[in-house]
UniProtKB/Swiss-Prot annotation:
Protein name: Homoserine kinase
Disulfide-bond pairs as recorded: none
Matching Pfam families: GHMP_kinases_C, GHMP_kinases_N
Purpose of the protein: Catalyzes the ATP-dependent phosphorylation of L-homoserine to L-homoserine phosphate.
Annotated metabolic or biological route of this protein: Amino-acid biosynthesis; L-threonine biosynthesis; L-threonine from L-aspartate: step 4/5
Gene: thrB
Residue sites binding ATP per the record: 91-101
Length: 310
């Protein structure tokens, strides 16, 4: 039996729409991500478990884990009879890479089960393809950090899909999921087809400056450059209370904040544990909208997807 855990991820990070993403893990040791188990069987089966299993499609063929198995078999040119189990711990449409968690865990578990016939680059390409079936287009800003860990910059040149960018150990990521759903497709549809020149220039300056600040080890500058002129001005209308929450966490002491992925999760970066706790407390009281919401204080997950059992 192979059991694989794939961590949550925060895509875009305000400054890098579709080209930056970070894998995250709670500081309290909780597993914030999906788990997929694969074991040999006479025929294929899929069992859904976990807190958010009831949110998955009732038709098995619509389940992305089934589609991962089907695509993996196609890639190898043979049917692979296995019993799969998806432990769905991630809320769907949360902005935390929920579909990426399932895709990464499923494909990595299948690859491990079969003796690693696919290398990481090919596996990541498949992950992007499968995740794109849910989000509506292929982009790697969730699957790459989820699979490889850390903060990843999408390259997509010279057969390189992404490369790691050095993060800052002192940064704590406070992630607040309010408990409502925002579909990636809906969040993309709300964006304009064209942007003003000054916005394009500002976006390029922010992103280039952020990457430079990461490599030159300037955390204050990096945090200051985490600004979003591409998506946030349009998407914030989908997120009740987002603008007030951003203002509040800044007043408490967060060094940066924004929309995680396409929302509705809000991320706030803090450089001190006590600030992170106060931000988390405020968000827990004021940003969550129902019992399904949660707040986690996280660090970068540098390990990425990993085998828990084999």
């Amino acid at each position: 039996m192979v059991k694989v855990y794939a961590p949550a991820s925060s895509a875009n990070m305000s400054v890098g729409f579709d080209v930056l993403g970070a894998a995250v893990t709670p500081v309290d040791g909780a597993l914030l991500g999906d788990v997929v188990t694969v074991e040999a069987a006479e025929t294929f089966s899929l069992n859904n478990l976990g807190r958010f299993a009831d949110k998955l499609p009732s038709e098995p063929r619509e389940n992305i884990v089934y589609q991962c198995w089907e695509r993996f078999c196609q890639e190898l040119g043979k049917q692979i009879p296995v019993a799969m189990a998806l432990e769905k711990n991630m809320p769907i449409g949360s902005g935390l890479g929920s579909s990426a968690c399932s895709v990464v865990a499923a494909l990595m578990a299948m690859n491990e089960h079969c003796g690693k016939p696919l290398n990481d680059t090919r596996l990541l390409a498949l992950m992007g393809e499968l995740e794109g079936r849910i989000s509506g287009s292929i982009h790697y800003d969730n699957v790459a950090p989820c699979f490889l860990g850390g903060m990843q910059l999408m390259i997509e040149e010279n057969d390189i899909i992404s490369q790691q960018v050095p993060g800052f150990d002192e940064w704590l990521w406070v992630l607040a999921y309010p408990g409502i759903k925002v579909s990636t497709a809906e969040a993309r549809a709300i964006l304009p087809a064209q942007y003003r020149r000054q916005d394009c220039i500002a976006h390029g300056r922010h992103l280039a400056g952020f990457i430079h600040a990461c490599y030159s080890r300037q955390p204050e500058l990096a945090a200051k450059l985490m600004k979003d002129v591409i998506a946030e001005p349009y998407r914030e209308r989908l997120l009740p209370g987002f603008r007030q929450a951003r203002q509040a966490v800044a007043e408490i002491g967060a060094v940066a904040s924004g929309i995680s992925g396409s929302g509705p999760t809000l991320f706030a970066l803090c450089d001190k544990p006590d600030t992170a706790q106060r931000v988390a407390d405020w968000l827990g009281k004021n940003y969550l909208q129902n019992q399904e919401g949660f707040v986690h204080i996280c660090r970068l997950d540098t390990a990425g997807a990993r085998v828990l059992e084999n």
